[in-house]
Amino acid sequence: FNVAANEIKSERTATIKFELAEKGVSAELKVTQIIPTKQYSFAELRALLTSAGEYKFDGDWFEAVAVADGGKENMDTDPMLSASSIDYNESATTNYLQGVDGKYGLRIKVATAADNTLKRGDKVKVSLTDATLVREDNPVRYTLKGLTANCFTIESSGNAASVSRTVSQIGDDDIYTL
């Protein structure tokens, strides 16, 4: 069957019912077609904040490539809770994405360590629903917070094409790129 594009400004829902009468088995699946959204480029995401601050999204999405394996240690600075206690959750909930062209990158913070499922080279579509983009200055860097595993749709797993550049092509904007 074909599903028509959602051209209205509201969500559409449907319930699909499956039944295997011979076995007495049935199931229901509720499907939601979301409000049409905008696809952002990395340059457009960065342009939303011209100085330190935050931008909250209602929807929308962008494409990216994961530059690290989720769940690895040393993904971020783990804060000291006391003289003998470290919060390792900071690294466990951090990963990094770059644009498909390799020009810009950003840090992502997912809700839990279990949500940090991306692998290096995964090409993904990232839903920005309920996400917050944070810009910090000195150095200028961007973090996307409020994501869960459900925000990522993997288009190709672990085999995104490498982007080659020389040292002369790398500048201050290349923070969080591979």
Task: Mark where each language-model region is.
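Strand-loop-strand motifs at the edges of beta-sheets in extracellular beta-sandwich domains
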Residues: 1-5, 93
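Beta-strand secondary-structure signal
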Residues: 2, 15-17, 28-30, 61-63, ...
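A short beta-strand micro-motif common to beta-rich folds, especially ectodomain repeats
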Residues: 3, 9-22
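Short, surface-exposed beta-strand/loop "edge" segments at domain boundaries and coil↔beta transitions
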Residues: 9-10, 25-26, 102-108
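Exposed beta-strand and adjacent loop surfaces of beta-rich binding modules
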Residues: 13, 28, 92-94
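Aromatic-residue detector
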Residues: 14-16, 27, 73-78
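OB-fold nucleic-acid-binding modules
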Residues: 34-178
